[in-house]
């Protein structure tokens, strides 16, 4: 599926914030080392790195179902409820 992460987050009133989803989720993916209390495997870390690069270097990017599930899982752990909801809605369409 193609997803455009270069959109601004919105606050609780629906006003556009200065933060893009690509930049904020990209930071999480670039810096992640654990999921919950468990360390990520080398493959998961590499997937996070590749997703970070895709998201921050393109308008609309191709995301596999495995990558989408990984993003939903990671964002659910590391983002606020409002940010997580926006990312999940974007991915799940």
Model feature map: region roles:
Residues 1-93:
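Positively charged, low-complexity terminal tracts
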